Swiss-Prot record:
The gene is rplP. Gene3D superfamilies: Ribosomal protein L10e/L16. The keyword Phosphoprotein does not apply. This is Large ribosomal subunit protein uL16. It comes from Renibacterium salmoninarum (strain ATCC 33209 / DSM 20767 / JCM 11484 / NBRC 15589 / NCIMB 2235). SUPFAM superfamilies: Ribosomal protein L16p/L10e.
Amino acid sequence: MLIPRRVKHRKQHHPGRSGQATGGTKVSFGEYGIQALTPAYVTNRQIESARIAMTRHIKRGGKVWINIYPDRPLTKKPAETRMGSGKGSPEWWIANVKPGRVLFELSGVNEEVAREALRLAIHKLPLKARIVRREGGE
């Protein structure tokens, strides 16, 4: 599971979800990738679940890159607690994903296997996404 080793502040404000991604919008490591079409908070559990779905489908071949990291804590107050008395305790770690961001990349397998593996991973994520291919003749 992806969790930061240490953070400067234990509790943070919720990150904004508006706007387009400015960096990480192209497939740079692998041959195929998953590109977000809608904004979302992706938790560390969802990232891990998508990674497992991909690696199980491609079996031993291929390599997977994870291009997002859950570096923001999301807090929650306990159930049946009255309002007030401060902010809740950190419950999850999230990555703030904006439209256009490439989340995962994959290489080393044929196109049919790669598309199916990425399709399985998209179903584990809380956003709409598409499968993109690397640009250029490499």
